């Protein structure tokens, strides 16, 4: 229902307009206060790059963060990552991730990013505290990438990158809750790069596709082509589950059942195992896998995806960030 409201298919969005106007008024006032320096943002001693969204829901932001961190690491840059840690609850903040940190403590995305990149990752509702925690433990870090936080103006940033779902784009264009917007589309004029996940990019936008890898067994780490798996049940607890189901079909998999879950939904063995009958195979997202690995069954697999950016602009962006991190 929410997708129909946000896309404009359902007329119910009109009933929510008063709340959207209030949301837009408050969010605009907050940004204006920082722009006029009525509120002061904290500036880190190293460059900060924000990778965020204008809309609620999954746009492919986390794969972009992983891509960015890995690309900078390959260029010899030492990167730290900070996040709000949605879906997690730590005993105290800031929380610097370690090999023992769970998704219940830090949230799904920070654990995934930590496991994929081995970069220092810290979470805190106050992102500046997370930055300070990283720099205290890893003083050699040259640049900070913040996963989400475009609207977290308390942390000053040097580069802003926005990720857009190229198919859904901005829906009906209204602020939450009548539409999907955290900020209106005009905000794109002030950011440094716009990355479009799928669909048809517009002038000045960087095209991106999510490239699936081999399926990975949660218990053994064994890899195989996902099309080799039989009697598949697909599970996705991400911002936009249909994208994952479409990816499986693109890989030649016709799931016997597709199970969409809420983003950041808590998972346990009983609930997940109940999705699969004898002889079936469960295939989930990598984001779900970080929550399920501790209690996984032998027939549970995940399908990792990597961001693939096209054109000349990604190289220019990486050159800019490398120069920033190097102090040039």
From Swiss-Prot:
E.C. number(s) listed in UniProt: 2.7.1.130
Q: Which domain of life is it from?
A: Bacteria
Give the residues the record marks as binding ATP.
55-62
InterPro entries assigned: LpxK, P-loop_NTPase
Keyword terms: ATP-binding, Kinase, Lipid A biosynthesis, Lipid biosynthesis, Lipid metabolism, Nucleotide-binding, Transferase
Its GO biological process annotations read: lipid A biosynthetic process; lipopolysaccharide core region biosynthetic process
Among Pfam families, the record links this protein to:
LpxK
Q: Which SUPFAM superfamilies match?
A: P-loop containing nucleoside triphosphate hydrolases (SSF52540)
**Annotated GO CC locations:** plasma membrane
Instruction: Output one GO MF annotation.
Output: ATP binding
Enzyme class comes to transferase
User: Catalytic activity, per the record?
Assistant: a lipid A disaccharide + ATP = a lipid IVA + ADP + H(+)
Pathway terms, separated by semicolons: Glycolipid biosynthesis; lipid IV(A) biosynthesis; lipid IV(A) from (3R)-3-hydroxytetradecanoyl-[acyl-carrier-protein] and UDP-N-acetyl-alpha-D-glucosamine: step 6/6
Regarding protein family, the annotation reads: Belongs to the LpxK family.
The record's section on NCBIfam families has: lpxK
Concerning PANTHER family, the annotation shows: TETRAACYLDISACCHARIDE 4'-KINASE, TETRAACYLDISACCHARIDE 4'-KINASE, MITOCHONDRIAL-RELATED
Task: Summarize the protein's role.
Answer: Transfers the gamma-phosphate of ATP to the 4'-position of a tetraacyldisaccharide 1-phosphate intermediate (termed DS-1-P) to form tetraacyldisaccharide 1,4'-bis-phosphate (lipid IVA).
Question: Which HAMAP family does the entry link to?
Answer: LpxK
What name goes with this protein? Tetraacyldisaccharide 4'-kinase
Q: Which organism is it from?
A: Escherichia coli O139:H28 (strain E24377A / ETEC)
**What gene is it encoded by?**
lpxK
């Amino acid at each position: 229902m929410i997708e129909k409201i946000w896309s404009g298919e359902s007329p119910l969005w009109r009933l929510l307009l008063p709340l959207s106007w209030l949301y837009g008024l408050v969010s605009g006032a907050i940004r204006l206060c920082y722009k006029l320096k009525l509120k002061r943002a904290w500036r880190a001693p190293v460059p900060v790059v924000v990778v965020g969204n204008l809309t609620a829901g999954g746009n492919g932001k986390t794969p972009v963060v992983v891509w960015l961190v890995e690309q900078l690491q390959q260029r010899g840059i030492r990167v730290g990552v900070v996040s709000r840690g949605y879906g997690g609850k730590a005993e105290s903040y800031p929380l610097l991730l370690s090999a023992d940190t769970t998704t219940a403590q830090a949230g799904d995305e920070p654990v995934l990013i930590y496991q994929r990149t081995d970069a220092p990752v810290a979470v805190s509702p106050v992102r500046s505290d997370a930055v300070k925690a990283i720099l205290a433990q890893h003083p050699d870090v040259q640049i900070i990438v913040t996963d989400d936080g475009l609207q977290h103006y308390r942390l000053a940033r040097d580069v802003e990158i926005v990720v857009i779902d190229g198919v859904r784009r901005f829906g009906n264009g209204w602020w939450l809750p009548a539409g999907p917007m955290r900020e209106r589309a005009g905000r794109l004029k002030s950011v440094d790069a716009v990355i479009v996940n799928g669909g048809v990019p517009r002038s000045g936008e960087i095209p991106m596709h999510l490239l699936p890898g081999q399926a990975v067994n949660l218990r053994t780490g064994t890899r195989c082509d996902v099309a080799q798996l039989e009697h598949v049940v697909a599970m996705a607890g991400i911002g936009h589950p249909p994208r994952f189901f479409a990816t499986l079909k693109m890989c030649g998999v016709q799931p016997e059942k597709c199970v969409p879950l809420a983003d950041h939904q808590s998972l346990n063995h009983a609930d997940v195992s109940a999705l699969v009958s004898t002889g079936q195979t469960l295939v989930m997202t990598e984001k779900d896998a970080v929550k399920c690995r501790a209690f996984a069954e032998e027939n549970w697999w995940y399908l990792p995806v990597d961001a693939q950016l096209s054109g000349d602009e990604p190289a220019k962006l990486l050159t800019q960030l490398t120069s920033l991190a190097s102090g040039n």
